[in-house]
C-alpha cells in the first residue's frame, strides 16, 4: 500500500461524486486544535492531482470559504442544477449549510445555497440518499433526525418524536438497495432502522448491553445486513448484523486495541471493509468471513474517519487528529523490498554508518488474498500473437471458477487463403502456371507486364524468351516481305538455263529466310566442286597472272598474295579503297586482317546509315555506346541487341544502365507509363534492388486507388492483398533468377532495405493469421543485424516455443510472511554440514525460470523457529563432521546458503561439541546469515516505476552480508580460518534475541550504536567470486607438503575472504591471486587427514542459472572417511622476519595500458572488448553492477596480456580462438575452450577467467 497524497488538515472530508478527477472537500473538525492553536473554521476543496506521479509537493486548496463553526460531517452529491454537485456540511452549531461546488471553485461570492437551523444542537452526521440524491438525512443531538429535500430545503420533516429518546444520534446510513430504509446509531447504544416512507422506526437491534455506537454501514448488496462499531476503549468491537435475526450479531470482528470511530463498506466489493479508531490504526477486513486482511500505515493520533472513493475504489482516504488526511491505494508497492535495497546501497565504511538509520514513515504491507471485485471480470478476451484469441469465461454463473479457451483468429480470411495457396504452389514448383495465373488476374497493365517478363525468364534460354516477349521473333520474315515489295529479291530470268521460278520448285514459299532462299539443286551443289581442278585436269580458260595492263596496286596485291602476305595485300586494297576486295582478302588472311578491314570500313562510314553504327558496336563489342546513346523510343531494339550480343558478364549492368535512363526520363517527363519499360530492363538484368522501388511505388498507388473506389473492402484488406502480390512477385523472381543477396552480413546501408521492411511487415501479417513458419521463412531473408527483424524473429521463436533469451522477471511462488519479521539470530559457531560416504550431489531444487539478467536468487529456507539458534541442515547425514565451518557448500556463493534453524528445544550447536583449536593468528570463522526474500510480487502490485524507491545519499553498490576479516583495508586476510579453541571465549558474541514484537512496530528511531559491540557485518558481494572448494584427495591419501602453498581456486576466491571495508581497496580475490601477497606461511594440514576437515557444506538448493552470476563448477568428490579433529599448529615465534610482508612485484606496465599487447594476443583484446561494449550498451540498467564487474575482470586479463605474464603462449592461442568463437556467436565452442583452460591450466587462471565466463553467458543472452 502506498500513500499517494496528504492533505495537511485536521478535518472531516467528503469525496467528489462522478468519474472526473477526484476532488476532496474538507471542513475543519469541530473540537480539534491545530498545531498553531488557530480557531479558524473553513470549507476547502482540494485537487489531488493523482495523474501526476510527483507526490513531493504539498497540496494547496483550490477553493476556500469561511464558516461560523466547525464541522462534524460532510457530504457531497450530484445535482441536476449544479454541474459539480452540492456540498452539505453538518456544523457544530446545529446549522446545515449547502454550497455549490462549481461556484466555490470559480471563487463566486454566492457559493452558499442555503443555511438551515432546524436542529437544536450539533448535527453529528448527515448523508445523501444513494438512490434519490435530493434527499438528505441529518442526525444530531437530542435524538433529532430530519429528512430534507433539496428542492424544498426550508421544510424538512422529522423522524421520531422528541419525547421518545434524548440521546445523541452519532451516525446514520441509507440502505443501498431499498431507498426508503435508514439506520441510525446513538450514543446510548440504540441501533434503529427507520422506514422513511412511513416515517416510523421498523426495529431496534439488541446492541449487546446498549454500548455506544460510533458508526453504522449497510451491506452494499444485501439489504438485510449491516455493521456497527463501538467507540469504547475497553470493548473495541465491530458487529455484523442480519436483520432477519436482530437479537444477536451474526459475527464479531476483533482487531482494534481501542475504540472504533469510523467504518466504510466498499460499494463495489462487499468483501472489503475499512475501519479506523482510537488506536491510530486503519484496518481492512472481509466482513463476510471475519478475516482481517491487514492494516495500513499507523499514525500518531486517532484516525476518526475513513472513506472509500465512491467511483474508484482503488483509492480511499483516512483523516486523523495528527493533522493529516492521507489518500492511499489498496495496491502493494513492496516497500520492504525497497527499504532492503536502500539499506544495501549504503556504503560499507564508517562514514555512512549512522546514515543507515532510515527516517522514512513507517508503512505496512499486506496482500489481499483475492482480487477485489472491481478487478474481476466474468469474461474477457485478448488477441494473442500468432492468430489466437484467448477468452476467459465462467464455468457456471455465481462460482469463482473460469475456463480458458484459445481459438484461432484471422483478421481477413482471404489473407490466410492466398498465403496458403501461394506456399503450396511454391512447393509444387510449377512457377510458370503461377505466373500465368497472376498475369491473368493482374489489376493493372504494369503488374501484368511484370508477370509476363518473369514468365519469359523461366524458359531455358531467358534471352530468347525476352526477345520473343519484345516481339522480334518474326522480324526476318517481315523484312523479306518488305524486300519483295521493293523488288530487291528479283533474280535473272534464268539461272544456268532455267527460270528462277522453276529452280525454286513449285511448292516453295515465295519469301523465306536467307538460308532457305535457294532450293536444293544437284547441279548447283556440284558447281564449286567442278571449279576445283583435280590432279592432272586441264581447263579451257587460260589466263595470265600479269598481262601488262595491271596498275601498280594490282601488281602489289598480286605479288603479296603470291607470297602469302595477306596483310600487305589488305593494306594496298584499303589504300585504293577497294573495300570488296579488302574484305575478301581479309577473310583469307584471318581474324587480324578481318578486324583491320572492319575498323577501316567503319571509319569510312561515319556518316553512313544507322545500322552501320549498330554493326560497329556489335563487332567492336561496345554495346555501352548503344545503351547510352540510342534514342529511348527504340529501347526495345536496344534490349533485343543486348539479349542477342551482350556478354554474360556485362548483360546485367547494361540492362541496369538502360533502365536507369528510362527512370531519368520518367522523372523528367513524369510519364509513369515508362515504369513498366524500366521494370522490364531491371528484371532482365536481375536487378532486384532497382525494380523493388518501382514495385513499392506501384503498390502505394494501387492501394490509394482501391481505397477510393472500393465499396466493401477495408483498407487493411486492400493493403494486405497488395503486399501479398508484391511478396509473390519478389519470391518468384528470386527463384527464377536464383538471386543471391550478398548484403545479409552487413550491419547497415542495405540496398534492399525497402524490401526488408516489406518482408518484416508481411511476416507480421501472416504471423497474425497463424502462419508462423511462413513468417519465419521471410524473416530469414532479412539480415541478422536488422533491428526490427531481430525483434520479430525473437517474437516468432517464442511463439513457436523455440529457446530464446528471456528477459522477463522471475516468477517466485508467493508465500505469506508476517508484517514484522523477527531478525534471525546469528551464531558464532558454524552449522554442521551433512557429509556422505559417496560423492555428494546437490538436492533437487525448484528453480525459477531462467533470466539471463536476474541476480542470483537465494534458496528457500525452512521456516521452523525464527528465534532459535541456527543448526545443521534438516537432512539426516550419514556421517557428520562437527568441525566443518559454514561456507559456500557445493560451490554456492557466500551469502546465499540458508541457515536451517532447529525445532524448539534444540541445543545451540556452539555448546554441543568443542571446536578444534586454531592458530594464534587465525580469525574466527565467517558466519553466514540468511534473510528470507521479501520481494515476492502479488496480484495488486503497482506497475513498475509508479513510485520512486528510496535512494541512499551515496551511490554505493548493494552488497550481501559477510564479515570483515581484517580491520586494515590493504592487509590480505588469511586463507584458512577456524573457530576459537576449546574452552576459550569467542572473540565476538552475537547480541541476544529480542522477544517477538507485539502488534506493529512503532516508527523507527535514530539511536547511536553500542561502542563495544561489533558493528553490522557488511554484506558479501553477490557478484564476487565464489568460495573456494578445498582440495579433495583419496581416503587414505598422504597430505601434501607444507612447503608448497596452494593458490586460490581457479573458479572462486576462498570463502574466508570477504570484501574489504574500504570501498577503494583492491578486491580480496585480486590480492590473493598472487602468492607474494600472503601474510603468513601456509599452515600444513593435520596429520593422517584424508582430506581437509574444513570442507564446504554442500548446498541443498543450487541457485538458478544466471549469466551474470558467478560460475558454478560441479561438486567435488567428498572424502570417503571422516577425518579426526585437527591439532592446533604451534604458534609461530614473533620475529621480524615472520611478520615482514612480501613486497608484491610491480607490474611491467601500468593498469589500463594496452599499447604493449603482442600481435598474437591483440585479437583477444579487440574482440572481447568490443563484445563487452555491445553487451554493456544493451543490458538493462538494473544490471549495471554485473556488467561492470565482468568488464573489470576482463581488464585484468588485458593487463596480463599487456605485461605478457601469467598466460602461456598456448593459452593465449586458445583464448584467441575463444574470442573468435564469441565473435562468430559460436558459444558452445567458446564454452568448451573455456572449460578446457579452467580444467587443465588452473595456474594461469584468476579473476579474469570468471569475467570471460560471464561474457560468454551475457553475450549469448544479449540480442
Curated annotation (Swiss-Prot):
Binding partners and assembly: The COPII coat is composed of at least 5 proteins: the sec23/24 complex, the sec13/31 complex, and the protein sar1. sec13 and sec31 make a 2:2 tetramer that forms the edge element of the COPII outer coat. The tetramer self-assembles in multiple copies to form the complete polyhedral cage. Interacts (via WD 8) with sec13.
Per its record, how is this protein called by name? Protein transport protein sec31
GO molecular function, a single term:
structural molecule activity
Q: Where are the WD repeats?
A: 5-47, 66-109, 118-158, 164-204, 208-251, 255-295, 298-338, 382-407
- Stretches of the chain forming a coiled coil according to its record: none
UniProt-listed Gene3D superfamilies: 1.25.40.1030, Functional domain of the splicing factor Prp18, YVTN repeat-like/Quinoprotein amine dehydrogenase
Q: Name one GO biological process term.
A: endoplasmic reticulum organization
Specify the species: Neosartorya fischeri (strain ATCC 1020 / DSM 3700 / CBS 544.65 / FGSC A1164 / JCM 1740 / NRRL 181 / WB 181)
Q: Which gene encodes it?
A: sec31
Q: Note whether Transport occurs among the keywords.
A: yes
Q: Where is the composition biased (Low complexity)?
A: 840-861, 870-880, 925-934, 949-977, 1062-1076, 1089-1099, 1133-1143
Q: Which SUPFAM superfamilies does the record cross-reference, listed alphabetically?
A: WD40 repeat-like
PROSITE patterns in the cross-refs: WD_REPEATS_2, WD_REPEATS_REGION
- What is its subcellular localisation? Cytoplasmic vesicle, COPII-coated vesicle membrane; Endoplasmic reticulum membrane
Q: Please report which protein family the annotation says this sequence is part of.
A: Belongs to the WD repeat SEC31 family.
